[in-house]
Amino acid sequence: MNQTSYNKKIGVSGLAAYVPPYRVWLEDWCDWTDNQWPKIREVVGRSFRVRGPDHSVYTMAATAVMRLIEQYDIDPAGVKFLGLGTESSTDNSAGAIIVKGMVDRALEASGRPALSRTCEVPEFKHACLGG
C-alpha cells in the first residue's frame, strides 16, 4: 500500500443521537396498568421515552443526522454511507431514503450542500420483527 492509503479517514468518526423529551415513568405506568413495579423495574428499568405528536422515526433520525453533521463539522457532500437502524419504520423499503431526503432539505435550508448523490442509504432491522 502507498502512504496515502494509511492517511484516509475510515470508520466511525462521530456519534450523535436524538432522544425525545417525552418520558413515561414505569412506576406510574405500573399503577395505571396494575402491573408489578419490582418485576418491571428489574426487567425494563425505570422509564421509557416516547415520540411526540410531531415526531416520527424519520424526524428523530434526521434530527440525529443533522446534530452529527453540525457537531463534527462534517462536509455533507463527503458522506458516503447513511444507515438507518430501527424497529419502528413505517415503510419497510424506503425509511433511510426518507431520512436522507429530510436531511437534504434541512441542509439546503441552512445553506449547506446536500449529502452525496452516491451516499449509500440502507435500513437495518434486527429485533422484535416477529412480535
Question: How would you describe each model-predicted region?
Answer:
Residues 1-83, 103-108:
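Conserved "HGTGT" condensation-loop signature of ketosynthase/thiolase-family condensing enzymes
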Residues 39-56, 88-131:
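Conserved catalytic cysteine-centered active-site region
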